Each structure stands twice: as structure tokens, then as C-alpha cells.
């Protein structure tokens, strides 16, 4: 296994690669052809395991001025959906298909956004979490640095370094990383100030500096691993939040909900879901346990804060390049807040390299305010994501709130639409499945778009279908639940018993979709 490069070596190699690319005939011709190209740049930013109410512009108390700034200049969506889990969401984002159709991370019989945009003359760049068996440079991206796997230690995803304790880890196996087409298993950074969120931000800025002055447009996908566990953050960021969560999760949920109502994100007629029945009341906790819980949420908040700082640095680079006006920025999360308990180092507090801790169900319940359930569930707490779009050239009125329904499968169609790129019927000699998503551009332009007749979800034992205002959802062996989402935004009043025919018809619709996906995946 090759030894991981130092940062200096990596930048030198990147410069050499850039020189070679500049001299390559096809790419040089592409740049000349793009000399008068006025298509938008596309900056796609994804958070990892972040709840609906965590950021400031969605009612949260966490400091996120840069993401909030995107909302002030653009549109916040209140009914946009992901796939409830990391890899399925990423497969749908990249392909515009349901993950069940394309073998999830394999993305078979599908073309990626990067492949389509690259063929249309875009420079395609990525950093961060890939979470698929292949590598980004094999699926249309010109450049890549990041975690090809699902999660890792933020301070050191590899082997123990001299003078340091062993890095906290979830499993014994090493996590895959990659620099361009070179894989590292493990990847052990030599820089002891390495921190994944900062490393991804730095790489994005470096690539913008390298390619941002080209005449043609760029597509940059930044897939942060924050605030996915383990809970790791810089001490100075943690200090900003230490003690603020001694108010407890009950008071936090109430405060967030009240801010959301005041912001107009949710109507007061929709009561927030009650505290998860498996979560104790904060006031019932022994005093000696409260400080530890406060620390967990402080570290989680610090991770989001640091991500927002990085987003601000990337946006500053876009402005420096003079490309802010015609850059479409999309920000979202891959699923809801995570209730998993993966506390591998119970004797090491969250934050430093040697720890491996999770935020756990009580705080995840608060992160997903006002909704029920969590990551991996197809109730709103698992699938409804903050979704922010900024595009100054097109979105003239900032601070908008849209209640039109969107889905992660719509991002591919949106990118094709704004880029003027044709979605192919075949790619590389292989037939490509028809696109499932629909463009969100009409919403950006102040119009009401023709949405989907039905939207579907399935992860593990959880499943759901939404048709208009009706949503049918179930988990495990539990019976289907039916909700009127116009009257009951937080899924508190199950109507399955009083509308059995509607529930049965929607269940059949879901079963037919699932069978179609199985056939398509089997043939891929």
C-alpha cells in the first residue's frame, strides 16, 4: 500500500496533474469552446446526519452564519426529502434514480451527475464522503480527495501516530480513502492538525483556485462527514457551546419549535411531536449526568459550526473569483439526526482523537424537531431535510420559504436543466434507466412546478409512499400508518383505520414500485 502523501507532496502532485490536463488536447479544446459559456457553476454541499432544526435558519441555536446567509439570499424548502440513510441518499443524488433501482452504491445502469456535466463541458470536482464501492474519478469527476467509505475518525482515520494515543474506531477494519484514483486503506495523515472537515474545505478551495478561472463552468460537490459520529471537534469550537445545553433536550425542543413558528417554517396549528417515549425527561436526570450530556451536544454543535466556517471559506473563494452571481448553491443533509448508540470509548469523553462517541437518541430527538423518529426511519424525522438554494442571477427575492415538495432524486434533473445538459439514453455502451427526478428550476424562478404523482422510500425495514397530501409509512412488522400531511405535518394522527381503502391503494402502489425496482436492479 502506498504511503499517504504529505500535504506539500500532494499539492505538488496536484500542480503537475493540472499542467498535464492543461496541455491535453481535448480539455484545451473544451476550455476554448467554453470561452463564451454563461451556464451557472453548481456548488452542491451535503451535511451528514444533521437534523432538520440544527442550523440557525431552521430554528437552531447553533452558529451557522454562512448557511443562514444562503437562506437570506435564496430559498428555504420545508418539504424536501432524502432517503433516510447515507449511501441510499448519495446514490439517488448522483443518479436521479431511486437507490433501489441502481444497486445503491454500485449505481448500475445509471449515469452520474458528474458524467453528464463533464460531457457537457463542466469541470467536475469532488471532496468528502463518497460511500460507494467505486471512486469518484471513475464516475465522472475530474478530481477527488476524501473518504470513499461511510465514516471515520475525524483527527486520524488511520494508524496510531508517534506520540499519540490510538485513534478511536468503530470497527477493526480500516476505512477507505482516496486521492484521485489512488486508494489508501488505511489513510494516516502525517499532519497532526489534520481534521476531516477542514481537509475537505481546504481541498475544495485549492481546486477552485486551480480551475475557477477557467472560462467554462464548474460543478463542485462537497460532501462533509459532519456532524456524523464520532463526536470530534476542535476545543475552541466546543468551548463556544459548553454549558449551553444544560437547559436540556426538552427545553431545547421547545425553543427550536417556537423559533421555527416565528420564522414561518411551520404553522402554529401543527403541534410538535412529543418527546420520544423512550427518552427520559431532562428534569428526571440525576444532576451528575447532566454535564456529560451537555458535553455531547456541545461537541455535536461544534462540528456543525466548523462545517459552516468551511462553507463560508468556500463561498468567499467563489466571490474572490467573481463567480458568485452565477453560481447555483444547494445545501442539504443526507438524512435526519442519528439516534444510534455507538459509544466505543465510554471512559473517554467526546471530542479528542482517542474518543469514539455518539450524540444518542435524546439529542437526536431534539435535532429532528418538530418531527418524529430518526435516521433510518421513513417518518419525517428521518427523511425531511433542510434544503437551501441560492442563485443570485435567478433568485431575485431572498429569504423565501417554499412548501413545494421535492426529493433527492430531483437534483440530477435540476443540474441537467440549469446546465443545458442532455440526460442520455445510454452511456459507455450501456443503456441507462430513464430519469426518475424532475427539475426544481421552476421553483427557483418563482413558479409552481408539476411535481411527482407519488414519491417512495425504503431503507431496511422502513418504507413509505407519499401521494399529494397523503403519506403511508411503516417500520418493521408494524402496520401501515396513514397521515394527512396538510392537516398533520408531524405525523401525530394515524388515519389508516378510518381510511382503509386509501391505505390499501397506497400500499399496493408501494408494492408495485418495490417490485419494479427489484426487476431493474436485478437486470443491472
Model feature map: region roles:
Residues 2-476, 480, 485-515, 519-522:
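Formylglycine-dependent sulfatase
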